[in-house]
């Protein structure tokens, strides 16, 4: 393509996005795109502009250095995707993105005025934590077909079925009765026995005497869509529902190839055709999930030996072992006992060379394992405990709780917490519908876009690291390792499983096959 035409196309593309190029920058860009065919040019320019917008820009005048960095990012060799096949991402390594309401997009932390996260959070971090939870749900709800404003000139029947979200400030500012209002807010109990709805603009007292609850577990500190009428400073609720969920494909259609999940890839692995091909070709790949692996129990170790013997001819890609790793928590000898138990486990693994050399082992700590209290995200088991095991089993990773696993284009979130009981105990009203508890539970987690939609006194969180507990965009597989009965359910194109407590459920565990996204229930009882 003629350099002048190329230059003109590039300038126009940048101008359409509100960006201007300096002379040196356009000269460099024209040279870099010289070998690109006319058919590919538009796609390539869009990728470069996206990469430019991801950088911290001081103005809309783009320098050469910014364009150089963007071109370099877009021209990375496809062969580099080989190192992106399998990655374990700890909670403290997850990238943080902040939603910008003005630009209607997620910005990396560096492009915002937020400080770097710190375990010793400030009051601002605590307020920001709830504000960000609200903002994510608000933008998701606003884009849902029921809440998008009707198109001008549309049929009256179409516009009649649309809803409009109101803020609490709007309600409180009215001196007359407001009928049929829908508000997105968080349920709080500011006074004992009295529930309030809270959003960034204010709080309003609720009257729940006539409220109908749709399916889900409605706990304090969860976000709801409340429908009702407002009179005399009280919001009388007719119905409670959760914010609508959204498949990850829909989220990515709006926000492009941002890598929300984490890992070495600059862009979302979902866009990689090469990784997708590898995933489909490797039909033997499997992930084995176990929870409550009590390594101090002889019977548990025997069952693990039987399992390894069974899998030895065709070793799984990965064993994900979740805590607690001791049946007797705490105590002065717990650390030494756990070191000895891990030594015994290493002995068993070494008995099966195929598994020892081929399979990866991921250890996710449980709530009663040695560590820093019960605040989430929880760091890995201490190196002093795991050192010897890691030397003997090199393909082992001791990670955080929760953690994320990326395999080819699939995203897996693993969380070890006895969450079902906690959420049932803290319900504003226990569900009366015939839906099974796991269905209520999974719907709640995905609707909230968060792993722990509970008050902080029930499930404490490091305020500045709350983003590490997000379930947005929705992963392909969500593993909630809970002592509740094992279950497998699908919601919003997300497969949700609970392997159950290994010793308490007759030695049951779950096996996931990424090539066809299926889960197999397995049990070692009777062996």
From Swiss-Prot:
In eukaryotes there are five DNA polymerases: alpha, beta, gamma, delta, and epsilon which are responsible for different reactions of DNA synthesis. It is found in: Nucleus. Keywords: DNA replication, DNA-binding, Nucleus. It comes from Homo sapiens. One of its GO terms (cellular component) is nucleoplasm. Component of the DNA polymerase epsilon complex consisting of four subunits: the catalytic subunit POLE and the accessory subunits POLE2, POLE3 and POLE4. One of its GO terms (molecular function) is DNA-directed DNA polymerase activity. GO terms for biological process: DNA repair; DNA replication; DNA-templated DNA replication; error-prone translesion synthesis. This is DNA polymerase epsilon subunit 2. Accessory component of the DNA polymerase epsilon complex. Participates in DNA repair and in chromosomal DNA replication. Belongs to the DNA polymerase epsilon subunit B family. The keyword Nucleotidyltransferase does not apply. Its main location: nucleus. Transmembrane segments: none annotated. The keyword Transmembrane helix does not apply. InterPro entries: DNA_pol_a/d/e_bsu (IPR007185), DNA_pol_e_bsu_N (IPR024639), POLE2 (IPR016266).
């Amino acid at each position: 393509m003629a350099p002048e035409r190329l230059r003109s196309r590039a300038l126009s593309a940048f101008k359409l996005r509100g960006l201007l190029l300096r002379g040196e920058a356009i000269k460099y860009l024209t040279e870099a795109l010289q070998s690109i065919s006319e058919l590919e040019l538009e796609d390539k320019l869009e990728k470069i502009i996206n990469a430019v917008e991801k950088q911290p820009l001081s103005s809309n005048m783009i320098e050469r250095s910014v364009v150089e960095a963007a071109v370099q990012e877009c021209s990375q060799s496809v062969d580099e995707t080989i190192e992106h096949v399998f990655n374990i991402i700890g909670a403290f390594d997850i990238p943080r993105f902040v939603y910008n309401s003005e630009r209607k997009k997620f910005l990396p932390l560096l492009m915002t005025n937020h400080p770097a996260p710190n375990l010793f959070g400030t009051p601002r971090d605590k307020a920001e934590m709830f504000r960000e939870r609200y903002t994510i749900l608000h933008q998701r709800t606003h884009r849902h077909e029921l809440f998008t404003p009707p198109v001008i000139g549309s049929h009256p029947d179409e516009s009649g079925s649309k809803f409009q979200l109101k803020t609490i400030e709007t309600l409180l500012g009215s001196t007359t009765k407001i009928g049929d209002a829908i508000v997105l807010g968080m349920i709080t109990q500011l006074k004992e026995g009295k529930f309030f709805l809270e959003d960034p603009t204010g709080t309003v007292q609720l009257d729940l005497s006539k409220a109908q609850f749709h399916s889900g577990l409605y706990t304090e500190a969860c976000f709801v869509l409340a429908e009702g009428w407002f009179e005399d400073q009280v919001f009388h609720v007719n119905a409670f529902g959760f914010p609508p969920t959204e498949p990850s494909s829909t989220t990515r259609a709006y926000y492009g190839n941002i890598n929300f999940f984490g890992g070495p890839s600059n862009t979302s692995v979902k866009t990689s055709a090469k990784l997708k091909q590898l995933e489909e070709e490797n039909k033997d790949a499997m992930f084995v999930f176990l929870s409550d692996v009590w390594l101090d129990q002889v019977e548990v170790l025997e069952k693990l030996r039987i399992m390894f013997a069974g899998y030895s001819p065709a070793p799984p890609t990965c064993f994900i072992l979740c805590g607690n790793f001791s049946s007797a928590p705490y105590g002065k000898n717990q650390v030494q006992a756990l070191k000895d138990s891990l030594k015994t486990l290493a002995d068993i693994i070494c008995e099966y060379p195929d598994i020892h050399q081929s399979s990866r082992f991921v250890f996710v700590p449980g709530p009663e394992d040695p560590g820093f209290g019960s605040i989430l995200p929880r760091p890995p088991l201490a190196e002093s405990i795991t050192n010897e095991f890691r030397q003997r089993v090199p393909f082992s990773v001791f990670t955080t709780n929760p953690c994320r696993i990326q395999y080819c284009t699939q995203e897996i979130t693993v969380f070890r917490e006895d969450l079902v009981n906690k959420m049932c105990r803290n319900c504003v009203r226990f569900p009366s519908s015939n839906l099974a508890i796991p269905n209520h539970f999974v719907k709640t987690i995905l609707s909230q876009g968060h792993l722990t939609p509970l008050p902080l006194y029930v499930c404490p969180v490091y305020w500045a690291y709350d983003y590490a507990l997000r379930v947005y965009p929705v992963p392909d597989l969500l593993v909630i390792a809970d002592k509740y009965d094992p279950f497998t359910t699908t919601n919003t194109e997300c497969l949700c499983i609970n392997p159950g407590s290994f010793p308490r459920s007759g030695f049951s565990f779950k096996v996931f096959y990424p090539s066809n996204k299926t889960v197999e229930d397995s049990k070692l009882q009777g062996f």
